[in-house]
């Protein structure tokens, strides 16, 4: 939602991070830049979800200070490798290097310091949004430079055929898969954050529209 005050309110409320959706949400590059600047001023981390294959937007978000990227529709190890090439500095990737950005503290850090900080703090999350991606989760998460996964349940449900397992079964399968055990698990929670964490999630995301609509409905007499 392209409203800078919302980002500021989330920071003041004490949330750990905000995920800015540039795939389905209406935020453009200018709004994203404002979100990142406000979050940085409050010391709150920002993750950005670009559109499918929008690696340049993701790179610009990282240059502007985003701490991570949640990349949609990562279907295979090859997709994951392309993602890492775009988002990681050499030698792990091929991202263009600049230190005069917000992420480089406007040229006040050394090149080596900026590279080390980017490598240490940049979180790369692959969204698994089809039965094929769920089946290949182990190979996707084995790619060096991919830190974790978020199952996109809406697209997963829309893309499955009648012969595929249910969304609940696919979710259970990827969470039980031993090849995903070392990856950061991100969950889109529709309810209690504590319940998602207790179930094994390390990062929990809430949909702002859902949160606001629930609050608005609760106001009705």
For the regions a language model picked out, list residue spans one by one.
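Alpha-helix-loop-beta-strand connector modules within alpha/beta enzyme cores
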Residues: 29-63, 85-92, 97, 116-119, ...
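Conserved anion-binding
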Residues: 56, 66-144, 148, 153-158
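Short, well-ordered coil/turn segments that N-cap beta-strands
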Residues: 15-16, 42-46, 66-67, 119-124, ...
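Conserved N-terminal beta1-alpha1 strand-loop-helix module at the mouth
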Residues: 1-46, 51-53, 124, 143-146
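C-terminal helical cap(s) of enzyme catalytic domains, especially alpha/beta-barrels
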Residues: 35, 39, 77-93, 162-163, ...
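C-terminal alpha-helical cap/extension of soluble enzyme domains
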Residues: 54, 98-105, 122, 128-134, ...
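Catalytic cores of alpha/beta
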Residues: 5-12, 53-67, 71, 76-80, ...
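Conserved beta-strand positions in the central sheet of alpha/beta enzyme cores
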Residues: 18-19, 70, 150, 204-205
């Amino acid at each position: 939602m392209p409203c800078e005050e919302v980002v500021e309110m989330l920071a003041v409320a004490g949330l750990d991070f905000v995920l800015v959706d540039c795939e389905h949400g209406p935020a453009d590059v200018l709004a994203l830049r404002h979100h990142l600047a406000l979050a940085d001023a409050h010391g709150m981390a920002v993750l950005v979800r670009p559109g499918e294959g929008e690696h340049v937007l993701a790179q610009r978000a990282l240059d502007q200070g985003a701490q991570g990227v949640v990349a949609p529709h990562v279907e295979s190890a090859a997709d994951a490798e392309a993602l890492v090439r775009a988002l990681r500095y050499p030698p792990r990737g091929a991202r263009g290097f600049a230190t005069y950005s917000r992420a480089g503290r406007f040229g006040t850090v050394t090149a080596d310091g900026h590279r080390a900080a980017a490598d240490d703090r940049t979180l790369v999350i692959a969204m698994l949004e089809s039965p094929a991606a769920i089946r290949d989760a182990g190979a996707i998460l084995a790619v060096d430079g991919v830190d974790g996964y978020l199952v996109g349940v809406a697209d997963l449900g829309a893309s499955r055929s009648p012969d595929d397992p249910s969304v609940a079964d696919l979710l259970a399968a990827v969470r039980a898969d031993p090849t995903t055990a070392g990856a950061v698990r991100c969950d889109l929670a529709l309810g209690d954050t504590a319940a998602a964490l207790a179930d094994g999630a390390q990062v929990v995301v809430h949909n702002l529209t859902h949160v606001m609509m629930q609050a608005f409905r609760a106001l009705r007499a």
